[in-house]
């Protein structure tokens, strides 16, 4: 009897360890996917690739900004087009170590982080560091942002 109980306990422990390892592996995988998509999006932003940038958002995008209010896909695209035309060298960089990613089962993932934007103003570099949340949806194998919250400006 005691021998059977030991095997049952061992089986339960091994199963729990296996499930924890699989859960961590899935979390690492989605983290890597979103970190990559963040890089793709802001490489497009920094290189002024408007078409690539546009392709990373859904048409029903909601963009919440603590200073600018609620805007949409069209406003975001127009902003990117203005950035591409300007010569102020606006650039975004993710603050190293700030990225957090949480799965949203059946939908996608939530990306939380801190980023710095720098641009030239009167010939001098002007930078600000801000917080953000991106809600990514994975549909037909493609990641796109459906919601943005930009805050702490």
Regions found by a protein language model. Give the residues of each.
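Short helix-adjacent coil turns
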Residues: 41, 48-49
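Amphipathic alpha-helical repeat scaffolds
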Residues: 35, 39-43
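A solvent-exposed, acidic/Ser-Thr-rich amphipathic alpha-helical stretch
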Residues: 28, 32-33, 50-107, 114-116, ...
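Bacterial Sec-dependent N-terminal signal peptides
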Residues: 1-29
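A short, structured loop/turn motif at beta-sheet edges
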Residues: 101-109, 123, 136-142
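A short acidic/glycine-rich loop-to-helix N-cap element
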Residues: 24-25, 122-127
């Amino acid at each position: 009897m005691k021998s059977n109980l030991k095997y049952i306990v061992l089986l339960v422990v091994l199963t729990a360890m296996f499930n924890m390892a699989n859960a961590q592996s899935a979390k690492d995988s989605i983290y890597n996917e979103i970190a990559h998509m963040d890089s793709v999006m802001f490489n497009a932003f920094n290189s002024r690739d408007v078409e690539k940038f546009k392709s990373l958002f859904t048409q029903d995008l909601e963009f919440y900004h603590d200073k600018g209010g609620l805007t949409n896909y069209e406003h975001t695209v127009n902003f990117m087009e203005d950035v591409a035309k300007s010569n102020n060298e606006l650039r975004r960089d993710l603050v190293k170590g700030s990225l957090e990613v949480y799965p949203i089962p059946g939908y996608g993932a939530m990306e939380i982080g801190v980023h710095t934007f720098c641009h030239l103003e009167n010939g001098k570099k002007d930078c600000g560091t801000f917080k953000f949340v991106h809600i990514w949806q994975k549909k037909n194998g493609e990641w796109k942002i459906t919601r943005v919250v930009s805050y702490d400006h």
